[in-house]
Amino acid sequence: MQDTLITATVNNCNINNNNNNNNNNNNNNNSKNSKNFNTSDLYNSVSDYKVESITEFQINQINMEQQSTKKRSASTLSAPPSTSSSGEEDNIINKNNKNNNNNNNSTNNNNSSKKKKRISNETNDDDKPKRPRKNEAVCTFCEKPGELLMCDGLCLRSFHISCLKARNLYNPSSSSISPVTTIDGTVRWECNDCVSSQNSCFSCKKRGIIGIDLMKCKVHQCGKFYHYKCVADYKLAKLINTKTPRFNCPLHYCSVCEVSGDGKQSVHCFRCPTAYHVICMQPGVKMLTKTRETRKTGLVLCPKHIGEQNPHDHDQIHNHTHTHTHTSQSNISSTSSSSVPSLIISSTSAIGSINTSGEIFQSSPPSSLTRKSSIPTSIITKSINNNNNNNNNNNNNNNNNLNINNNLNINNNNNNNNNFKPIQNNIESNINPLHYLMYSTSPITSPTTLSIPTSPLSSPSYSPNYTANFKPNSFDVNQQQQQQQQQQQPIKIPKYINNFNAIKNQQKLLNTNNNTNNNIYNNINNSYNRNNQNNNLNINNINNNNNNNNDGEYDDLYDDISQYASSLMSIKDQTVSVSSFSSPSSSSSSSSRENSFSSNINNINNKTDESTIIIPESFEKMHNSDRVACLKKSLQQQMQQQQQQQQQEQLVVQPKKLDEGKLIEQFFQFSKSKNFHSQNCKNSFTPY
């Protein structure tokens, strides 16, 4: 009986080995086991063989036998006849094999599916399982976390709904912006940039069309777009040579160790393509996300952007419509607890508003403001300070403060301007400027232009065409009085500037005779023309300080002289001798230069009676800075003599254009001429 059982199993194994060779694609494990099978091992284990302990190899072989019915019928015909007892045992074996086959079918299917997936990952990169994309945990505009609306497009940005509404980027009535349900039942929402296939370069911040101007980073979880030229400038960017330009942006590589950040704890800057490993992070980095979920891909601000203004706030200021209705303002003033006291105005007062162009509009007063004032109008004194601070308020950058003083002064202080112009009192008129500058409680229904009475001509900021276009000012009554007194006082100019006719005549000589050094002369005139305004201001400062102490009186003038001196001494090594008073025909001979120069100086001496500037003998060996200091001292001596004469004469001259550059040019040309180096030359120089 045992012998028949052994022969039956051996025959079944041989048949199953033949079936395995034909069906290798269905089950790889069975083919491997069939090759390693030996009948000798089976004969050795016959003594310990039992019907219940069937090996996994036999189970797999029987499974293959059931799949091919034809071969199983052939195997039954080829099997030797067996007794009734052996047939019963074979039936028991077949029943047990069928029960075990049902349990192993599921395991084989799972193994085959896993193997198929592994094979697909190795062959095709596009079929790899990709990690789910995560949106940024910070609002794109305000750079703060909170309840965010996440875009399902390519950009992976997140927004506050309030930030979208403030920038007119969210319109629920628009079909392109409202959430859309897909076929699967999922809800998707995309921002305007993803809908219109536009975005901005993360490097240069310039907008472009996706796919034409801008290219997206190849990394699946990255939503940054770049110009191809901008990415090529970064050494950390990994460019991939394929048919289409693809790249990995610098956000995926540490800027310190220049190693990829995949699988490591890293953070990247929210404003520029800079990333760090947490270990390599530099001091001064500001963390924007501190939660556990965003710890591996944290958002920071690198040290380049610490202290900078948010660029989206800057765009909001310039792109804002500036149309503030009274309804929204009344809601804000009613809900928020502000320190500004409420105004109670009679029914006869005018109500108005100011638009961006500076025009004043009037509307009918509401019925809620017909109460009488509890404070006498003679005691109420008002002043409005409109402070424009670009760093504090993101909406309008205006802080309206109401103060009580003795006069109505409207001061609009701007951080960028320091000009001041006064606005005089207009309390006696029927206009109440406090109300149209402050928040009103009703919208404008029928705006009409206010008629403003004309102010006296002495007021510099009032005019018949006054439209409440308040310029930034820091007004003070005492400063206004001082300014008026300064305008009425006569302007006193030092004596060396008085003879303007001599200057004009000398300029004609320069224009006719200065042909050899036109380039030098043009450079001096250009440098002088750039500083005309500063020179005129210096004249006013000198005239206002004539009756004061002499210390530091001409400091601004000396600074300008030093600038001209340094510019002129830089060209001292030129081959052509510098002499603006010599003609081209006389430039070849040194004697003709000396005669022309001395004749021009004699003409100037005949026209002016000024004192001379004493030049020391060691002037030629001095450094440029020492020469300027020497020139300052000599000019100081001359200025003191001129001031003493002015106190006696008290000359009054109208302000005219000052040509200080020519005086300095004349002096340095004289120092470079041969007359200055000759022994017969008197070491003195007389300016015009």
UniProtKB/Swiss-Prot annotation:
Coiled coil: 627-654
InterPro entries, per the entry: NSD_PHD (IPR055198), PHDvar_NSD (IPR055197), Zinc_finger_PHD-type_CS (IPR019786), Znf_FYVE_PHD (IPR011011), Znf_PHD (IPR001965), Znf_PHD-finger (IPR019787), Znf_RING/FYVE/PHD (IPR013083)
Bias-annotated ranges (Low complexity): 16-38, 74-86, 93-112, 326-339, 526-550
Name of the protein in question: PHD finger-containing protein DDB_G0268158
Domain of life: Eukaryota
Organism whose genome encodes this protein: Dictyostelium discoideum
Any one GO biological process: chromatin remodeling
Region (Disordered): 16-39, 65-133, 310-339, 381-406, 526-554, 578-605
PHD-type zinc finger segments: 136-197, 198-260, 261-287
Pfam families: PHD-1st_NSD, PHD_NSD, PHDvar_NSD
Molecular functions per Gene Ontology: zinc ion binding
Family matches, as CDD domains: PHD2_NSD, PHD3_NSD
Organism ancestry: Eukaryota, Amoebozoa, Evosea, Eumycetozoa, Dictyostelia
Alphabetic keyword roster: Coiled coil, Metal-binding, Repeat, Zinc, Zinc-finger
